[in-house]
Amino acid sequence: MSAHKTFIIKRKLAKKLKQNRPIPQWVRMRTGNTIRYNAKRRHWRRTKLKL
């Protein structure tokens, strides 16, 4: 990734950064909850973004 990024690329990277976090603990504590973890979690070295 270059140091000089276009704004569109930077905005996409910011969105992916926000998506790449674990689910909050209060979501797990909800009644009748089946979500255990974030299935769409991405590791920076294993899976690359298609930008």
Curated annotation (Swiss-Prot):
Keywords of the record: Ribonucleoprotein, Ribosomal protein
InterPro entries per UniProt: Ribosomal_eL39, Ribosomal_eL39_CS, Ribosomal_eL39_dom_sf
Any GO molecular function: structural constituent of ribosome
GO terms of biological process kind: translation
Keyword flag S-adenosyl-L-methionine: no
Keyword Nucleus belongs to the record: no
GO cellular component: cytosolic large ribosomal subunit
Superkingdom of this protein's organism: Eukaryota
HAMAP family linked to this entry: Ribosomal_eL39
Family: Belongs to the eukaryotic ribosomal protein eL39 family.
Record-given protein name: Large ribosomal subunit protein eL39
Source lineage: Eukaryota, Metazoa, Ecdysozoa, Arthropoda, Hexapoda
